[in-house]
């Protein structure tokens, strides 16, 4: 699984009538979920923010979760050897069952609860992202950016950081501020 490409669909983007056509198959020339599945490059499928899709659409996934087959009015996609991951923002198993409903809930093989990242994990993430972003800088930019100062600033505020996206955005912003500040001071 690790190192493989990921087929990802952001279900929060599909909350209207157009999603029905996309999910159940519209005209043959229209974009649809089944065709996207056929063209995927990975057997790891991420249905991100599964909880955001309207409950009326859950039935489209019953056969996929039960038998590994996704079928719309135009295509039949065999996915038996795939790993399907659905994410949501629910806080408990009871909340998942209540909001999604039992028919879809009991089709999930396993539920993994997300816990806040430990301080050690956050520091490892900080270091990985800082090193990656620093290596992307040009030699002249590296002379301007005090990367160790940024690293120390983040270490001191590590418990205020929430997730990888948050850390990445802050690091990019801090590097950007240093570059802009230096450019303005040179003028």
Indicate where each model-derived feature is located.
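Walker A/P-loop
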Residues: 1-9
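Signal for well-folded cores of large energy- and translation-related assemblies
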Residues: 2, 24, 28, 38, ...
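Short loop/turn elements that form and flank the Walker-type P-loop nucleotide-binding site
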Residues: 2-3, 17, 38-41, 55-56, ...
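Hydrophobic positions in the central parallel beta-sheet of the AAA+
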Residues: 9, 45-46, 84
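Short glycine-rich substrate-engagement loop in P-loop NTPases that contacts/grips substrate
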Residues: 11-41
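Canonical AAA+ ATPase core
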Residues: 29-33, 49-121, 132-133
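Eukaryote-biased detector of low-complexity, proline/serine/threonine-rich segments
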Residues: 41-42, 167
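Conserved AAA+ ATPase small/helical "lid" subdomain
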Residues: 108, 112-127, 134-185
């Amino acid at each position: 699984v690790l190192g493989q490409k990921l087929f990802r669909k952001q279900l929060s983007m599909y909350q209207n009538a157009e999603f029905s056509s996309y999910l159940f198959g519209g005209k043959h020339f229209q974009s649809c979920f089944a065709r996207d599945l056929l063209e995927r490059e990975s057997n790891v499928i991420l249905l991100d923010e599964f909880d955001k899709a309207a409950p009326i659409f859950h039935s489209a996934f019953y056969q996929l979760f039960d038998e590994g087959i996704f079928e719309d009015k135009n295509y039949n996609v065999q996915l038996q050897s795939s790993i399907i991951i659905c994410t949501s923002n629910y806080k408990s198993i009871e909340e998942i069952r209540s909001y999604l409903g039992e028919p879809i809930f009991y089709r999930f093989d396993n539920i993994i609860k997300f816990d806040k990242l430990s301080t050690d994990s956050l520091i490892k993430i900080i270091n990985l992202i800082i090193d990656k972003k620093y290596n992307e800088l040009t030699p002249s930019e590296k002379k301007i950016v005090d990367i160790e100062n940024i690293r120390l600033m983040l270490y001191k505020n590590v418990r205020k950081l929430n997730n990888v996206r948050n850390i990445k955005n802050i690091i990019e912003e801090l590097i950007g501020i240093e570059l802009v500040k230096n450019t303005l001071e040179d003028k």
